[in-house]
Amino acid sequence: MGVEVLGGIFSKRFTSIVGSFIWFIITPILLYLPWPLAMLGFLTLYGALPFGVGIVNWPYPRDACGC
């Protein structure tokens, strides 16, 4: 019984580690894979028009359009 409990704790910890690892791997892929789509979403969110200027100055989209 002690071994089962230990195994259960280990498997829970293992799945959480794997889950967080997968989360850290997949999230950037999801963020960067549809890059123009994501940029379009970010820029429309910030109201940074024109889009080209917003993409060049992405960290400061408000400064890009002078908003």
UniProtKB/Swiss-Prot annotation:
Domain of life: Viruses
Protein name (database record): Uncharacterized 7.4 kDa protein
Organism: Thermoproteus tenax virus 1 (strain KRA1)
